[in-house]
């Protein structure tokens, strides 16, 4: 008898365990990416300045035009 035959029943089990781990790992990353994207969209929609450590929130009005004196500011990584 060959010693290889002892490992034959474990091959499908190992394949199932590895494939399940890969699927769970990929699913978790996709879920976390989606949650982060939704959180950023929520903060941008609500102009959630508290996310950046400021004291007040200002709602975004979709039809309003930006003021002429509007300047571009760099957003820190803490907002995301």
Curated annotation (Swiss-Prot):
TM ranges: 10-30
Keyword match tRNA-binding: no
A GO biological-process term: symbiont-mediated suppression of host innate immune response
Main function: Plays a role in the down-regulation of the host NKG2D ligand MICA by utilizing the lysosomal pathway for its degradation. In turn, MICA reduction diminishes NK-cell killing of HCMV-infected cells.
Compartments it resides in: Host membrane
Signal peptide feature range: none
Protein's name according to its UniProt entry: Protein UL148A
GO cellular component: host cell membrane; membrane
Keyword set, alphabetical order: Host membrane, Host-virus interaction, Inhibition of host innate immune response by virus, Membrane, Transmembrane, Transmembrane helix, Viral immunoevasion
Membrane topology of the entry: Single-pass membrane protein
